[in-house]
Amino acid sequence: MHMNPTPLPHSEDDGVMFASIGQTTLALTEPPSALHATDTLDDVFGSEDVQGSTSFTTEPSDMRRLQSEHTTAGYREGVTVAKAASVQAGFDEGFGLGATLGLSAGEIVGVLEGLAAAVPGDERLAALLGEARGDFSARSIFGATYWDPNGTWTYPVPGQDGGDVIFRDVVEAHPLIAKWRVVLNEQIQNWGVRCDFFAEDQVVDEEVVSQKKLGNPATALKAATSTAPATQSRMSDALQW
């Protein structure tokens, strides 16, 4: 018996293919396109990876989550400990230098403010005061032009190669401090300001404090009252330019 299968016409919409083998007709109910059918929700949730679903997991499902949590916690703890140690060490090292620098800058600006207040009509003093305030702002005086990121000065300091250098040496060598020291000295000479007046009063104050510490209130009061008239006289002379 010779069988010659003859495919019959079919429609692409019915999903059925007919084949004739002799007098027998067979219906193939599974179209080839069924293997590639797509789900309408694949665009939202993604398609299932049939091949990947057969692979076996070599570690528990929570292992990766726990590992990530421990890594994050360890990183935070390390940053916290390192920050505390670094900040304290940096503060201990930089506080003295920063305080000395701020004191010198404040001294220069303060004297210029006093001169500008004593002579309100002088435009030169007003301009110098405004310029000094800009130069001695924290952003300017502590800027990258004069300091490394680690807090070391980048400008030359006299004596730093051969001997000991103290904070005062570093501060007075700062380009902005050196610049305004010259300007301030010129204005002091022009207006006849007595800078030793403040030094003498400081000596008197130190004597009063020392007598109080020694338990001699009467001596401390005598030292304070004996210098009061002289102090007032010098203040009047200094303001009468």
Curated annotation (Swiss-Prot):
Taken from the UniProt entry, a GO cellular component term is:
cytoplasm
Polar residues: compositionally biased ranges: 224-235
Instruction: Give GO terms for biological process.
Output: protein maturation
Q: Where is this region: Disordered?
A: 222-241
Pfam families assigned = Yae1_N
Superkingdom, natural source: Eukaryota
Q: Where can this protein be found? A: Cytoplasm; Nucleus
Looking at the UniProt entry, the stretches that span the membrane are none
Tell me the segments the record calls region deca-GX3 motif.
74-114
What UniProt keywords are attached to this protein's entry?
A: Cytoplasm, Nucleus
> PANTHER family from the entry?
PROTEIN YAE1 HOMOLOG (PTHR18829:SF0)
Family under the similarity heading: Belongs to the YAE1 family.
Q: What does this protein do?
A: The complex LTO1:YAE1 may function as a target specific adapter that probably recruits apo-RPLI1 to the cytosolic iron-sulfur protein assembly (CIA) complex machinery. May be required for biogenesis of the large ribosomal subunit and initiation of translation.
Q: What is this protein called?
A: Protein YAE1
Q: What is the lineage of its organism?
A: Eukaryota, Fungi, Dikarya, Ascomycota, Pezizomycotina
